[in-house]
């Protein structure tokens, strides 16, 4: 499917989401912007997702956060560690709290225990929580040093799981 078709698909698929529709209608006629947002899917790299905030397959938004989280949930369930849970932290960037909450809700809906911090926490606190609680993984919503229009979804896992999760998500996410 080309980027124009994907753009149209999002307009139809999210017709009841006013925020998404308003943003997407706001770029109507701007071929370069539509292409940039929809020519590819945001890729899961070594530590997770990172991208410019906005609507589209190549942007950081709740839909891509849910998609990545479903991939993580499927992996943890396949490993039999869903009851160990996932600790979730977030920083002060735009929508970090929203993405963290969506991560927790998506994990819970998939049957994976989720521990969501109730306020901002730095990455070292997340890594401590993962070990202290015996979690299978941790997620921190942050884009670290990137400009303010970016956000990210970073995974924290034990080394034994990290490579196989990354490999699985790179294969699986296009189908989710």
Walk through the language-model features, giving the residues of each.
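Gly/Ser-rich phosphate-binding catalytic loop and adjacent alpha/beta segment
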Residues: 3-176
């Amino acid at each position: 499917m080309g980027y124009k078709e994907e753009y149209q698909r999002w307009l139809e698929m999210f017709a009841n989401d006013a925020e998404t529709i308003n943003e997407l209608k706001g770029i109507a006629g701007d071929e370069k912007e539509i292409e940039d947002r929809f020519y590819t899917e945001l890729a899961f790299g070594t530590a997770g997702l990172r991208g410019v905030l906005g609507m589209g397959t190549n942007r950081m938004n709740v839909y891509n956060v849910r998609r990545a989280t479903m991939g993580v949930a499927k992996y943890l369930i396949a490993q039999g560690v869903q009851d160990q849970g996932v600790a979730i932290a977030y920083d002060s960037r735009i929508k970090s709290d929203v993405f963290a909450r969506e991560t927790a809700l998506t994990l819970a809906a998939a049957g994976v225990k989720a521990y969501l911090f109730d306020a901002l926490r730095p990455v070292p606190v997340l890594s401590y929580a993962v070990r202290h609680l015996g979690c299978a993984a941790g997620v921190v919503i942050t884009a670290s040093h990137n400009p303010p229009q970016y956000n990210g979804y970073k995974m924290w896992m034990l080394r034994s799981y990290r490579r196989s999760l990354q490999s699985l998500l790179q294969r699986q996410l296009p189908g989710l």
